[in-house]
């Protein structure tokens, strides 16, 4: 696994090459953003929209709540996320399942995700990103640190690592 932080300039120049690579893979057709009911997740949707534009694919937004918790999210925040998704021309789906990483992996595979966008794991993490990467190691995961001006850190699939090393992405 290669984890790299990309500057805006690298993302733009790299996005062209990635878009060319993706056009060869016809079964791949979306960027999937995984959100929780927090207003900070609007940044994830906006970052996911930029990534989807680089790839030239649609944006999908996913939120998975634990069944055992019932419907407890703040409805105002959830409505704001729906509006943000709508403004970015994305569909937003909400599911109730006690295995959110497994469900996200299944949806990513079914929709042919080229990139999965998540928040950056903090202390007391649920290990969502690690589990997701274990389940779909062939899909890039972009973690957005909303507390650090939206910096994006990427978990690069093994098969794509030589390309990233050639274009100068630095491992962290």
What are these regions (language model features)?
Residues 1-25, 88-116, 122-124, 150, ...:
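Structural beta-alpha unit
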